[in-house]
């Protein structure tokens, strides 16, 4: 006898509704204000270009300027010029053992060179190590230098013990001296201890630094004005894009058709903006937002609504990728399946016009892989099966979604060629490192909620059973895995690299979003009120006061 709807026991999650309603559908484009801002930015841009290219600027002054531009969020206007400067400075082979270069300067230069892929040695910090192999006690009064060392240490790779020690020393000392520092340095330290620069979302970090820089007695008013204007101009563009995807989402009306799923289109746009915020990636942001939003529904269908018979059919339908499969699907998922195929038809048509139809093919194949892994996970849950950690992790690296989202992040990037998609399909070291970070940090943040919902096949549970470990030991191990994976990402970003820097930056920025979204072991995507709401308001609602 067929199972009736009444008899079906569904694993309903009862997700909270969207925080935003129709707020971003009612967007005022502000075209006149944008035009005015754009003209002002272009004028200021010429002046800053002269500052960067000035031949008379010395190493220390030029590096300080580059750091300020990057932290104010305006360096994307001058990427070529900054790279040329850094290449020139790196090839000078500066002797950083010279007493002229203090801890602040050496740490800043190390960080900038590493951020731009230069293989500068961590041995340059050796002059601050005492006879016992520890950082010198005298450094504990140098708040500015310690903060610079702290930020630099996050770009370490495996085996750089001196930077592991630097992070431990700087973190402990900064926590101790922060209450005694003067503003704005104290504010900068407190923020950095919560959110290291290298792990942070570039736009959030720019917003924060603008307010700190404004308090700086040595600030350049010209740069500050440029940063504020540019921030607000970019915000106008992002609001237009958010308006577009919000309208698309409302017209699909999947919220009413699939009430079990999370309604998070705004948070999905926040995610996409974190991958690339620059104006030239406007189309890519919109395409990525749509794919993330659809993935979220698939995730909730497997995790929080579907029963195994339905999921068997749905998995087959995704594999076959044919509109005729709709007849076999459960009624509730038919509108979604149709919308998903139509979305990719639109992508394929658009990409075919520029000779990049292969991009959609790689994205669809990656989505099929994701769905197969979701299916495995769902069967584990329904069967009450707790896999060995190695078996769990192999599948969970796919269900973290980052393999698929890294691929779809390149859909709207015209410079992304087929070789880039082929590279990702082979799951290179940098991508695997990114998947590991996403997986273990997500597992830590969602463990308690999943446990309450009866989810037994979690990474934490699997690790604890295999290793006879406590919850505290498992969490510590997961953080250790994430730390090592970050070191691998840092290594893979160094030159020479056969891979496109554009692609490497997408992976790096995706990991930064994980650090922000799951801050404090909170699931900021599922419950955005505490973690993401303030960021979304700062980025997409409130302009910076001039």
From Swiss-Prot:
Look up the record and name the cofactor or cofactors this protein needs: Mg(2+)
Q: Name one GO biological process term.
A: sesquiterpenoid biosynthetic process
Motif DDXXD motif: chain residues: 299-303
Record-listed E.C. numbers: 4.2.3.199
The top EC class is lyase
**Which sites bind Mg(2+) 1?**
299, 303
Q: What is known of its domains?
A: The Asp-Asp-Xaa-Xaa-Asp/Glu (DDXXD/E) motif is important for the catalytic activity, presumably through binding to Mg(2+).
Subunit details for this protein? Monomer.
Q: Which PANTHER family match?
A: ALPHA-HUMULENE_(-)-(E)-BETA-CARYOPHYLLENE SYNTHASE, OS04G0344100 PROTEIN-RELATED
This protein is called what? (-)-5-epieremophilene synthase STPS2
Q: Which organism is it from?
A: Salvia miltiorrhiza
Q: What is the lineage of its organism?
A: Eukaryota, Viridiplantae, Streptophyta, Embryophyta, Tracheophyta
């Amino acid at each position: 006898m067929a199972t009736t709807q009444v008899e079906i026991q569904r694993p309903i999650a009862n997700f909270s509704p969207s925080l935003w309603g129709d707020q971003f559908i009612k967007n005022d484009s502000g075209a006149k204000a944008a035009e005015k801002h754009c003209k002002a930015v272009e004028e200021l841009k010429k002046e800053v270009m002269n500052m960067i290219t000035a031949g008379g600027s010395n190493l220390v002054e030029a590096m300080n300027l580059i750091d300020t531009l990057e932290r104010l969020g305006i360096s994307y206007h001058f990427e070529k010029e900054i790279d040329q400067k850094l290449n020139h400075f790196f090839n000078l082979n500066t002797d950083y053992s010279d007493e002229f270069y203090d801890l602040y300067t050496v740490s800043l230069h190390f960080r900038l060179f590493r951020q731009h892929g230069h293989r500068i040695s961590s041995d340059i910090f050796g002059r601050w190590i005492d006879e016992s192999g520890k950082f010198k006690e005298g450094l504990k009064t140098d708040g500015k230098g310690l903060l610079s060392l702290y930020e630099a240490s996050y770009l370490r790779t495996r085996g750089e013990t001196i930077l592991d020690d630097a992070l431990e020393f700087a973190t402990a000392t900064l926590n101790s001296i922060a209450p005694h520092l003067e503003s704005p340095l104290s504010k900068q330290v407190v923020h950095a201890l919560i959110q290291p620069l290298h792990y942070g979302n570039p736009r959030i970090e720019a917003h924060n630094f603008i307010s700190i820089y404004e308090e700086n007695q040595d600030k350049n008013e010209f740069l500050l004005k440029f940063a504020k204007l540019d921030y607000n101009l970019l915000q106008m563009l992002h609001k237009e894009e958010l308006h577009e995807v919000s309208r698309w989402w409302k017209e699909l009306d999947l919220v009413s058709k699939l009430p079990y799923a999370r309604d998070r289109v705004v948070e999905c746009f926040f995610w996409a903006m974190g991958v690339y915020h620059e104006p030239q990636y406007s189309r890519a942001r919109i395409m990525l937002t749509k794919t993330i939003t659809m993935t979220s529904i698939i995730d909730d269908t497997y995790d929080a609504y579907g029963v195994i018979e339905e999921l068997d059919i749905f998995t087959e339908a995704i594999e076959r990728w044919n509109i005729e499969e709709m007849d076999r699907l459960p009624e509730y998922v038919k509108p979604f399946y149709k919308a998903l195929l139509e979305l990719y038809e639109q992508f394929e048509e658009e990409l075919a016009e520029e000779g990049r139809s292969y991009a959609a093919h790689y994205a669809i194949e990656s989505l099929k892989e994701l769905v197969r892994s979701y299916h495995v996970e769902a069967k584990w849950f329904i069967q009450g099966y707790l896999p060995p950690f190695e078996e769990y992790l192999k599948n969970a690296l796919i269900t973290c979604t980052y393999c698929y989202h890294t691929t779809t992040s390149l859909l709207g990037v015209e410079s992304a060629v087929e070789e880039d998609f082929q590279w990702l399909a082979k799951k290179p070291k940098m991508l695997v490192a990114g998947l590991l970070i996403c997986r273990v940090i997500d597992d830590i943040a969602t463990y308690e909620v999943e446990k309450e919902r009866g989810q037994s096949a979690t990474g934490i549970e699997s690790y604890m059973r295999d290793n006879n470990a406590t919850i505290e030991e498992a969490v510590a191990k997961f953080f250790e895995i994430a730390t090592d994976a970050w070191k691998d990402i840092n290594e893979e970003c160094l030159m020479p690299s056969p891979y496109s820097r554009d692609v490497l930056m997408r992976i790096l920025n995706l990991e930064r979003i994980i650090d922000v979204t799951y801050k404090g072991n909170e699931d900021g995507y599922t419950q955005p009120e505490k973690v993401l709401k303030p960021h979304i308001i700062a980025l997409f609602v409130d302009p910076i006061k001039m």
